[in-house]
């Protein structure tokens, strides 16, 4: 049996609680996907996969459903510790080809830094599979221009959640690409 997702939506959340597991549950609730049995998968954006809004995607989920997702997750119980979770996305111009989703879960990076890193990672993985020549030592903005000017990569973006740890609590952040039939 083959299952290639045809739809995807992106969501994120943050949770805080005195218990580690409960902070994760609250992050799932914030992302509105707590009712699913999540199965994490690796990072391929399926060919011809349609992006849905969070609201449209949630309508397709049922409580207890086995749900596939690419998830970036990070937690801390350190006061003022900055954490982030990002999903980077890179899509080919040719929709019959697959794209990439990357997960990044750093400490000490802002949302912008984490998101840019994840997006860069996804775009670089896609560029190497498409045979786009580039200098990996150039900064992201320059490589992004090369990738898009090649005509082979049409879009890249990220979804990121960051937060600072609070005294006496676990803080968990998640970013997810939820894959649907």
UniProtKB/Swiss-Prot annotation:
Its EC number is 4.1.1.19. SUPFAM superfamilies: Pyruvoyl-dependent histidine and arginine decarboxylases. The record marks 42-43 as: Cleavage (non-hydrolytic). Its cofactor is pyruvate. One of its GO terms (molecular function) is arginine decarboxylase activity. InterPro entries: Pyr-dep_his/arg-deCO2ase, Pyr-dep_his/arg-deCO2ase_sand, Pyruvoyl-dep_arg_deCO2ase. It catalyses: L-arginine + H(+) = agmatine + CO2. Keywords: Decarboxylase, Lyase, Pyruvate. The modification Pyruvic acid (Ser) is found at residue 43. It is an enzyme of class 4 (lyase). Gene3D superfamilies: 3.30.60.30, Pyruvoyl-Dependent Histidine Decarboxylase, subunit B. One of its GO terms (biological process) is arginine catabolic process. The keyword Lyase applies. Binds 1 pyruvoyl group covalently per subunit. It holds the Pfam family PvlArgDC. Belongs to the PdaD family. This is Probable pyruvoyl-dependent arginine decarboxylase. The lineage of its organism: Bacteria, Pseudomonadati, Chlorobiota, Chlorobiia, Chlorobiales.
């Amino acid at each position: 049996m083959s299952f290639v997702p045809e739809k995807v939506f992106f969501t994120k959340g943050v949770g805080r609680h005195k218990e580690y597991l409960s902070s994760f549950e609250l992050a799932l609730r914030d992302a509105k996907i707590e009712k699913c049995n999540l199965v994490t998968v690796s990072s391929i954006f399926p060919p011809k996969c349609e992006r849905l809004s969070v609201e449209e995607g949630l309508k397709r989920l049922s409580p207890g459903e086995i749900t596939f997702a690419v998830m970036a997750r990070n937690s801390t119980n350190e006061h003022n510790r900055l954490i982030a979770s990002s999903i980077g996305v890179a899509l080919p111009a040719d929709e019959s080809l697959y794209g990439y989703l990357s997960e990044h879960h750093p400490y000490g990076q802002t949302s912008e830094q984490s998101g840019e890193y994840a997006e860069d990672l996804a775009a670089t993985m896609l560029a190497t599979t498409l045979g786009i020549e580039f200098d990996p030592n150039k900064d992201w903005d320059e490589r992004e221009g090369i990738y898009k000017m090649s005509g082979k990569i049409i879009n890249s973006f990220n979804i990121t959640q960051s937060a600072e740890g609070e005294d006496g609590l676990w803080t968990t952040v998640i970013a997810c690409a939820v894959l649907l039939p």
